[in-house]
Curated annotation (Swiss-Prot):
Function noted in UniProt: GTP-binding protein involved in protein trafficking; required for the sequence-specific vacuolar sorting route to the lytic vacuole, for the ER-to-Golgi transport and for the Golgi-derived transport to the plasma membrane. Involved in the recruitment of COPI and GDAP1 to membranes. Required for recycling of PIN auxin transporters (e.g. PIN1 and PIN2) in a fungal toxin brefeldin A (BFA)-dependent manner. Involved in various auxin-dependent developmental processes.
Domain of life: Eukaryota
Protein's organism: Arabidopsis thaliana
Group of enzyme by EC: hydrolase
Positions with a binding annotation for GTP: 24-31, 67-71, 126-129
Regulation: Activated by AGD7 and AGD10.
Family: Belongs to the small GTPase superfamily. Arf family.
GO-annotated biological processes: auxin-activated signaling pathway; protein transport; regulation of auxin metabolic process; response to brefeldin A; vesicle-mediated transport to the plasma membrane
UniProt GO molecular function: GTP binding; GTPase activity; mRNA binding; phospholipase activator activity
PROSITE patterns the record matches: ARF
Protein name: ADP-ribosylation factor 1
Reactions that this protein is recorded to catalyse: GTP + H2O = GDP + phosphate + H(+)
Subunit structure: Interacts with AGD7 and GDAP1. GDP-locked form interacts with cytosolic tail of p24 proteins. Interacts with AGD5 at trans-Golgi network. Interacts with A.tumefaciens AK6b.
Localization terms from the record: Golgi apparatus; Endosome; Golgi apparatus, trans-Golgi network; Early endosome
Length: 181
């Protein structure tokens, strides 16, 4: 009896670890999001060549977040980060109407990869503070998210610079990754 209570206690209160891959087209705001979550402040960023990785502690969960560069020349490298990924954060610049089709194509190409078949998908519709930003419903439509019948997905409106929506996204991720575990 004591052993089962101990197991229950540790399951409830032990720190959980989750591996998250954050990708998206260049200049979508991935690195700004990562460091807003990690440091709580806005950092000056330059285009990511390669990756940034940080551990973000939130609600007794340790998220290891891999922020991988999004320039078209280095997108083929994304697949090297797929293994053991539990959650995928796809960041979209909601103000970039010219490249939303490109974002959709990259997202669907990635979701067809076998190594990501069990990963849940969180889309951050970023840069919602800009006046011409597409809202979450429009991004959902443009990215073809409703066609993802076999995948847990969610879209969250965000503003990386203010932090708005970021923790709501992490809440959804933690609840949905935990329910699949």
């Amino acid at each position: 009896m004591g052993l089962s209570f101990g197991k229950l206690f540790s399951r409830l209160f032990a720190k959980k670890e989750m591996r998250i891959l954050m990708v998206g087209l260049d200049a979508a705001g991935k690195t700004t999001i990562l460091y807003k979550l990690k440091l709580g402040e806005i950092v000056t960023t330059i285009p990511t060549i390669g990756f940034n990785v940080e551990t973000v502690e939130y609600k007794n969960i340790s998220f290891t977040v891999w922020d991988v560069g999004g320039q078209d020349k280095i997108r083929p490298l994304w697949r090297h980060y797929f293994q053991n990924t539990q959650g995928l954060i796809f960041v979209v610049d909601s103000n970039d109407r010219d490249r939303v089709v490109e974002a959709r194509d990259e997202l669907h190409r990635m979701l067809n990869e076998d190594e990501l078949r069990d990963a849940v998908l969180l889309v951050f519709a970023n840069k919602q503070d800009l006046p011409n930003a597409m809202n979450a419903a429009e991004i959902t439509d443009k990215l073809g998210l409703h066609s993802l019948r076999q995948r847990h997905w969610y879209i969250q409106s965000t503003c990386a610079t203010s932090g708005e929506g970021l923790y709501e996204g992490l809440d959804w991720l933690s609840n949905n990754i935990a329910s699949k575990a």
